[in-house]
UniProtKB/Swiss-Prot annotation:
PROSITE patterns: COMPLEX1_30K. The keyword Magnesium does not apply. This is NADH dehydrogenase [ubiquinone] iron-sulfur protein 3, mitochondrial. The gene is NDUFS3. It catalyses: a ubiquinone + NADH + 5 H(+)(in) = a ubiquinol + NAD(+) + 4 H(+)(out). Core subunit of the mitochondrial membrane respiratory chain NADH dehydrogenase (Complex I) which catalyzes electron transfer from NADH through the respiratory chain, using ubiquinone as an electron acceptor. Essential for the catalytic activity and assembly of complex I.
Length: 266
């Protein structure tokens, strides 16, 4: 009886396992070969490139022309990038009127200030470019508003239009030194008290002007001028194993004695 039950159980087990029945591997005991799903765990690293949408491109271009017609006093340039992003360059005096128009107009409704930053281009007369990135959740659209200024001319604060511009403008003032007029609390936000200069300017030295260290004698952190003095060092880059020494050393020129104007012809 027991033998019959064992045989029935063994037959049922073989039917359930099917192709995954026990098999004998050479040199090893019997193992159960189970199907294994082999897939590469490496993620696809190809960049995601949005295709150009001709319909959206035309709509943004038409809207940019519409804004230029409504505010011709302030809008100086309108362009649409290849990724369907509208850019409007305005006069510095038009920050409040243009941003208010884009926020409140029924066909715009750019009610969110996604980002506010600056770019330093020292070769320009107005070296600082202020960039406002706006978002319209109603129309799922973005727009970039650009204006410009120099080291001394202030820009009107956009805090009355977008409350989110408060800390953005403080950061621009701290990093670039662009002054925003009528800002409710324009003070440094990232650097320490008494910091000299503005670190994101292209003419700011990489080492800075002062360094902070803990003074064990006075038991506090002190600020001292940066000192990067070192002895003169000469680096000899020539090597006896140089494969192409001609590219390392310039060809020797004939030495002329006093009074000679050209070397003698041989």
């Amino acid at each position: 009886m027991a033998a019959a039950v064992a045989a029935a159980a063994r037959g049922c087990w073989q039917r359930l396992v099917g192709s995954a029945a026990p098999a004998r591997v050479a040199g090893r005991p019997s193992v159960l070969l189970l199907p294994v799903r082999r897939e590469s765990s490496a993620a696809d690293t190809r960049p995601t490139v949005r295709p150009r949408n001709d319909v959206a491109h035309k709509q943004l271009s038409a809207f940019g022309e519409y804004v230029a017609e409504i505010l011709p006093k302030y809008v100086q340039q309108v362009q649409v990038s290849c990724f369907n992003e509208l850019e409007i360059c305005i006069h510095p005096d038009g920050v409040i009127p243009v941003l208010t128009f884009l926020r409140d107009h029924s066909n715009a409704q750019f009610k969110s200030l996604a980002d506010l930053t600056a770019v330093d281009i020292p070769t320009r007369q107005n070296r600082f470019e202020i960039v406002y990135n706006l978002l319209s959740l109603r129309f799922n659209s973005r727009i970039r508003v650009k204006t410009y200024t120099d080291e001394l001319t202030p820009i009107e604060s956009s805090v009355p239009v977008y409350k989110a511009a408060n800390w953005y403008e403080r950061e621009i003032w701290d990093m670039f030194g662009v002054f925003f007029a009528n800002h409710p609390d324009l003070r440094r936000i990232l650097t320490d008290y008494g910091f000299e200069g503005h670190p994101f300017r292209k003419d700011f030295p990489l080492s800075g002007y002062v360094e902070l260290r803990y003074d064990d004698e006075v038991k506090r952190v002190v600020a001292e001028p940066v000192e990067l003095a070192q002895e003169f060092r000469k680096f000899d880059l020539n090597s006896p194993w140089e494969a192409f020494p001609a590219y390392r050393q310039p060809p020797e020129s004939l030495k002329l004695e006093a009074g000679d104007t050209k070397p003698e012809a041989k």
